[in-house]
UniProtKB/Swiss-Prot annotation:
Source organism of this protein record: Canis lupus familiaris (Dog)
Pfam families linked to this entry: IL3
Glycosylation positions in this chain: 79
Name recorded for this polypeptide: Interleukin-3
One Gene Ontology term from the biological process aspect of the record: immune response
GO CC annotation terms, alphabetical: extracellular space
Subunit structure, as described in the record: Monomer.
Length: 143
């Protein structure tokens, strides 16, 4: 008598005993809504008052483009956007949607700082941050 059918039955039973993965399923296909939200925020930032033409210094750029600081920087922008009543709530509503997409790695440095109630500083830095966020999401979206 062959043990082949018994082996199949044992494999089937073992397969049923494997614990299921917990958490959200990982999908490489991000909905287009996230890229649309980035564009909506950029449009709000480009409206009047016109954004400051003053360039960011190299340390600020590095801080905004650092992948390990994406989540801490998002927290800073969420907090700062609540201080700007006109567009702040709309920006905050869009930005908070990115929280579940960003990992919380050990940051390599301090998050960005934004001058208190300074719309121009907020605009300049958020535009560069959105560029980094878009790059991160595009990379994550590639198969």
């Amino acid at each position: 008598m062959s043990s082949f059918p018994i082996l199949h039955l044992l494999l089937l039973l073992l397969g049923c005993q494997v614990p299921q993965a917990q958490g959200r399923p990982f999908s490489t296909d991000l909905p287009k809504q996230y890229f649309t939200m980035i564009n909506e925020i950029m449009e709000m930032l480009n409206k009047s008052p016109s954004p400051s033409e003053e360039p960011l210094d190299s340390n600020e750029k590095e801080t905004l483009l650092e992948d390990t600081l994406l989540r801490p920087n998002l927290d800073v922008f969420l907090n700062a956007s609540s201080k700007f009543h006109k567009n702040g709530l709309l920006i905050w509503n869009n930005l908070k949607e990115f929280l579940p997409l960003l990992p919380t790695p050990t940051p390599r440095g301090e998050p960005i700082s934004i001058m208190e109630n300074n719309w121009g500083d907020f605009q300049r830095k958020l535009k560069k941050y959105l560029e980094a966020l878009d790059n991160f999401l595009n990379f994550k979206n590639k198969p």
